[in-house]
Amino acid sequence: MSVNEKYELRGINHLALVCADMQRTIDFYSGVLGMPLIKTIELPNDMGQHFFFDCGNGDTIAFFWLVDAPDGVPGISAPAGLPGEEELNSATGSMNHVAFAVPPEKFDEYYAKFKEEGIKVSFVLNHDDSPMGVTRHPHDGTFVRSFYFQDPDGALLEFACWTKTFTEADVVHEPRTAADRKVPVAR
């Protein structure tokens, strides 16, 4: 296992997203996903609110409700929809999605539960090193299993479970640079 020799980082303290309706956000994250609301803050000068939810293992996901936040733009500020159905692109500097770790032994149960509750979910993706990067069925080369869904504001969320431990052999690709990008031209 790799160790950070420079800083003693202990994971993600929180991710902060922006919502349009804090009550709807509470209803989804606490009501649908079962995450306890653990801290609420009123921002100064009537700027808005900042609420935190416990998403397990001491990690939190937070939301700003800002009185003057612009509306999100699907495909720019976040992906337009679920993987396999819509474009997965989002703008440079944006958050593409949040993946919550779930126990591998409960993954299929959770997927079925989402479907039973009528939550729109992607098909299960079994991520691997094949040319397409995913398969419909798990196999020995699968390194993570996941499914995707969206919150009420369109943020792309994922339930994921690791299925193997990585080694140095898993780091094989040369990093791309800004020069490799194909930036769309505005009309």
Q: Model-derived features: where do they sit?
A:
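A detector for short, charged/polar N-terminal pre-domain segments
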Residues: 1-7
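Vicinal oxygen chelate
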Residues: 10, 22-23, 80-152, 175-187
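Core segments of cupin and vicinal oxygen chelate
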Residues: 18-71
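Conserved beta-strand edge residues that scaffold enzyme active sites
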Residues: 43-44, 127-129, 163
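Active-site-adjacent scaffolding segments
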Residues: 54-59, 74-83, 89
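A short, polar/charged loop-to-alpha-helix boundary motif
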Residues: 72-75, 164-178
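Conserved Rossmann-like nucleotide-cofactor binding loop
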Residues: 155
